[in-house]
């Protein structure tokens, strides 16, 4: 005799993607495959340049190499599964795979968030306390900050996964997205729990606000320090070291904010998926170009690497 409370039916999960139109699937496949390859190759090139070129063996580029690695993993969490689903003409994803994808995505999303804050702190010390820079931002501190970012990101993902595993889904779960995203899963439960929804929605926002606030504080001190420099050339030199990082910060947080605004304002089942493309795919793809085009040290290192290969 089977008790209704003793067993729990595992629902079927489906990723609806961007469009139900079958004629658009090939175009979407080619577009995302191209962006994924550019993302992986571009970030791998940045990592290779930093590892092989000794002038780039500094804290600033140590953090950049970590950011490039995280961006590769960040995109690899979502895009390959979407490409496989398009290729096989299947929208299905298992419950275990969905939870795993959501958890891993959360880890790398928060790592991006924390690493941008760490990089802002690095620029703050370099510009505001240049005489003590090598003493303060030493190898031990660099490794410690990266490890701490990993630990907090993993703990956050574990917390969210634990909550999602307790949620009840009624019937088949059709996710209007191209990956298992936390906010989408929280909206598809059939038994609402106010405390669970508060944690699922507020904790990521709180972590983002903390990191963004630390970035704002770092740049407030940086701007104050730059304004005190008397020479125009000195101001330009100091600020030029921050331009690439500022560009990435703007892309990351503006596109992330756009996802939440779009999903809240636009009442479309696929609006959140389309908006999140900038946040999850385009930004990691553009990061290597921003650093290679705007950063003289990286451009010179790239030239030396290419000359050595030819």
UniProtKB/Swiss-Prot annotation:
It is a multi-pass membrane protein. Glycans are attached at residue 5. It is found in: Cell membrane. Disulfide bonds join 98-190. Residues 1-25, 89-100, 157-202, 262-272 are extracellular. InterPro entries: GPCR_Rhodpsn (IPR000276), GPCR_Rhodpsn_7TM (IPR017452), Olfact_rcpt (IPR000725). Belongs to the G-protein coupled receptor 1 family. This is Olfactory receptor 7A42. It comes from Mus musculus. The lineage of its organism: Eukaryota, Metazoa, Chordata, Craniata, Vertebrata.
